[in-house]
Amino acid sequence: MRRSAALTSVTMTAVLALSACGGGGGAQGTGGGTGTTGATGSAATAATGGTVHVLANADFSHLDPVRGFDGGVNNFYRLIYRGLTTFGAGPGEEGTKIVADLATDTGTASDDAKTWTFTLKDDIFFEDGTPITSEAVKFGFSRAFDPEAGIGSPYGKLLLDAPKDYKGPYLSGDLDTIETPDDKTVVVHLKKPFADFPSALALANFTPFPKGTGAGAAFDTKPIASGPYKVASYQRNASLKLERNPQWKAETDTVRTAKPDAFEWTFGLDPATIDERMLAGQGTDANAVGPSIQAATVARVQAPQLKARTLAGLNGCTTYMGMNTTKKYLSDVRVRQAINHAIDKDTIVAAMGGSTLAEKGTSIQPPTVAGRVEYDPYPHDVEKAKQLLAEAGLSGGFSLSLDTRAQPKMAAVSVAVQEALKQVGIEVKINNIDTSTYYEVIGTPAKQTDMAVTGWCPDWASGATFLPPLFDGRNITTKGNSNLAQINDKDVNAKIDEIAAMTDVTQANAAYGELDKQIMELAPVVPLAYEKLILVNGSNIAGAYQSNSFSGGVDLVSVGLAEPTK
């Protein structure tokens, strides 16, 4: 996940409603996304030059890769950052493969996959010309533990072996469990064996940085690039421009084509305005990409001239409602089960734009995750919900607060939840939170209310990236917490450990499918929907395809212009 904004998971705060979700398994992914793919524009392959424009409703959460973890920002990160590994570039399974990036290969495991060794490529540099060394890798990894900065992806803290009191490089110094015997060699020790570690390293929170840099919020305004582009200018909530990074060497990078000379984001646009501009395709909008279109626009893209530049498919994420099990009423499993039965998923789908843009959620894991089991544990049943509430001694009614993003689609979803729970005597008070701070608020247990509408996208197509981050109670943190239910069940924790020890990825994925059912017996969340994307690209956009590693959004590392001089 990545969070979808879903998380983006659900039309995210940022532009393409994208997020990191990929196919796992060490050197090659096995995930099965369902997005329709293809190339758009007047040429299947982008030419060199020109500026790609991106139209967005909201700014990215953070430019610092240990802070940001929502859908839109993960795709963006690959333009300016590189890691030891990354996802391949291409539609379908090609885009879910795990390939070497800064490292010469996807790593060598020892000690039953508890220790991993990597060798860095030659001629790799940061934007200021500083070589990317093993010390930079070690420093970048350790930043995930900083209590202020490390609020994004949980995988650094989940996987890397570190003392319990370690608080990152700025407060605690070096992380000794990452060895750097020379400038080119990195030896990483994990808490436990993890066969999918190369897949985890494809996530941006493992980005190397020069030692000592990035304290506080420094990288949120001026990050240090290692990819083909660097930040040229940035006005928060208004615009962002990337220009070429002259220190990037194309011969060291098999993934990023870097065809455009620049990328320019425009933030703060109304979704309906974006739709109108993308359909019209006038001026620089012919060179633009944007988020999934709104429900009201769907019928219009059936016109042949628009259909030719349209992509559609599942975004690979689950939109869900987390229920804080530490709260008075929600600590009772019967109440949580009642809420699951009470919510009418058809009204949720309608709120998200209808069946063209969403399908009903049943399991926690979305259809694109390997090993996922198709089942529906809580079909809509108002009478069953009332019965469970009566058994809990709450037939007289009570009230709950629901956190949601101040964004039209999520507001509509929240109202649908409110109306459904009203039918069983539960009054829901909706708490609208600004998109730019939403995940920080709901990820801070001290600030959480009763429930929150959010989303999660697998970081690669495995339950390992879906269920442990959301439901392992031993990893609840004071900031950047992804276990919104704050559930800490010993049987669930034990099963997570059992699956994590499996070295057969197929066996592990099947076990996660069964764990999904075990968790839903406790009803800590309500799976609401699986969102679909319909993307209309500018007529001059080339090389565009939906990526299964970025929630069905356009993979920015391959996109470019058919005619750069237009």
Per-range role (PLM):
Residues 151, 156, 232-243, 264-327:
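Extracellular/periplasmic solute-recognition and catalytic clefts
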